[in-house]
Amino acid sequence: MEKTFIMLKPDAVQRGLVGQIIARFETKGCKLVGMKLMSVDQALAEQHYAEHKGKSFFEPTVQYIMSSPVVAMVWEGKNVVALARELMGATNPANANPGSIRGSFGMDISRNVIHGSDSVASAEREIALYFRPEELCDYRKAGEEWLSE
């Protein structure tokens, strides 16, 4: 089954939005298989955003992600990467659909409350950065048979 990496950024944690955002994934039938509240250090932040090194927003993004705890999660489900992208909405909350996570909670392009993998390959890379294999739970979710064929 496909997995994706989701991070609730410092603004989501500080504003007390964690439960509301998790509920959106659960309501859509996604299965939570890994989660941790953690502080991101410089090395991990730079690894996570390595593809943006050299861009003007790289350093501010690294500093921001280190400014307060984040919630790192792994979700599983059918086409979960695309589903998560739809739930999150456009990166800039001003362009996000009303009702999407960023449309509902995002303040601006920097403080948009959530990060999600943009592809299966990115999900694999990001999951490996934040979780050891033994930290992910393999289980059958009650009612799972009602959520996909």
Swiss-Prot record:
Keywords, sorted A to Z: ATP-binding, Cytoplasm, Kinase, Magnesium, Metal-binding, Nucleotide metabolism, Nucleotide-binding, Phosphoprotein, Transferase
Pfam families reported in the protein's UniProt record: NDK (PF00334)
UniProt enzyme class: transferase
Entry-linked SUPFAM superfamilies: Nucleoside diphosphate kinase, NDK
EC number(s) given by UniProt: 2.7.4.6
Residues forming the catalytic site: 115 (pros-phosphohistidine intermediate)
GO MF annotation, one: metal ion binding
Cofactor names: Mg(2+)
Keyword Metal-binding: yes
InterPro entries: NDK-like_dom, NDK-like_dom_sf, Nucleoside_diP_kinase, Nucleoside_diP_kinase_AS
SMART domains hit by this protein: NDK
Major site of localization recorded for this protein: cytoplasm
Catalytic activity: a 2'-deoxyribonucleoside 5'-diphosphate + ATP = a 2'-deoxyribonucleoside 5'-triphosphate + ADP; a ribonucleoside 5'-diphosphate + ATP = a ribonucleoside 5'-triphosphate + ADP
Family note: Belongs to the NDK family.
Identification of the protein by name: Nucleoside diphosphate kinase
